Amino acid sequence: MYVAGVMSGTSLDGIDVALVHIEGSGVGSKVELIHFTTVPFRNDIKNEIQQVLSIKNSNVQLICSLNFKLGLCFAKAVKEVCKEANFSLEQLDLIGSHGQTIYHQPKPEGNMISSTLQIGEPAVIAYETNTTVISNFRTMDMAAGGQGAPLVPYSEIILYRHPTKNRLLQNIGGIGNVTVIPSQKSDQNVIAFDTGPGNMIIDEVCQRLFQLPYDQNGEIAEQGEVVDEILTYCMNHSFLKMNPPKSTGREQFGEEFVSQLLKRYEKHSKENILTTVTMFTASSIVHHYKEFILPYYEIDEVILGGGGSYNDTLVEMIRYGLKDEKCTIFIQEDIGYSSEAKEAIAFAILANETYHRNPSNVPSATGAMQSVVLGNITFPPIR
């Protein structure tokens, strides 16, 4: 099958689309990336997303409208990846659309219940592309008692499981998440969970203090010094003390967190603040390895992916934090995979599994009571 995986993450960089060819289904699937592209959001769309992400500024009218606007954006992005690949849209069998997360509350307080909301109307995508769409991947896992995240472990088992080596896959997107993939000869379980902020705080600080969308290659963070009192404040966040499985998002490490941090430590230089929040991402990752993984698994390789793997300063901080461990650290490109395309490929794989009615959550990662088939299916009109 030819499948387009569509991902719009917490970092709001744009719409990632991976065009892949998948043979078969299940853990024996063969997956080939044909083409990958990122379609940036128009400024007005990005501003509307940022508005609905804010509890203070959001409103139901805007969410309703944006749901359909994003459906059109996602459909346009699918057409773009096909155009760039010289691939006929009519040949496309399936689209897996993650959608844009508006709110995710796996462990809410008060009278709220565990829930999640992604928008980007699948009916609009199906109509515009004349292709079947799989969407809303997180909801069934949450209905089964899971946290709805992380969902990439199933695809990582297919793509990265090694005959003899135990691997850690660390994704560094807006949020960081890790998957432990034991070797094929091991009888240990796959586990996965969010490690805290990835690029989210770094990017927000860059935008506010330097008027830049992100710290390219970590060049600014390389110039500053870590401020111990800021790092201690960050590392005392309650999320780091929780046991896995667990997930997090903009609700805990978004604009409000950054506003409080900058107000509290405004006396420090902006370079030192950026260096310190970069170290926070690295330290939160290393903390979770040493606390929850390395005492129980003998890890041979750590593979870093996602946009954060292009931040050289962040990568070096992670290497330094793991310098006393026996594992070898790679970037995904070192082993022949694209860091940028990882999550889009994952949702293409999950769409293929749903199409074949195969469960594709990993209960040991999400905390769900059972394996379930993920997502909703939206068929195109008959023409």
Swiss-Prot record:
Keyword presence, Nucleotide-binding: yes
Coiled coil feature spans: none
CDD domains per UniProt: ASKHA_NBD_ANMK
Enzyme class, UniProt record, top EC level: transferase
Alphabetical list of SUPFAM superfamilies matching this protein: Actin-like ATPase domain
Keyword Cell inner membrane: no
EC number from the UniProt entry: 2.7.1.170
GO molecular function (one): phosphotransferase activity, alcohol group as acceptor
Biological process annotations from GO: 1,6-anhydro-N-acetyl-beta-muramic acid catabolic process; amino sugar metabolic process; peptidoglycan turnover
InterPro entries: Anhydro_N_Ac-Mur_kinase, ATPase_NBD
Record: residues binding ATP: 9-16
PANTHER family with a match to the protein in the record: ANHYDRO-N-ACETYLMURAMIC ACID KINASE (PTHR30605:SF0)
Similarity-based family: Belongs to the anhydro-N-acetylmuramic acid kinase family.
Protein name: Anhydro-N-acetylmuramic acid kinase
The gene coding this protein: anmK
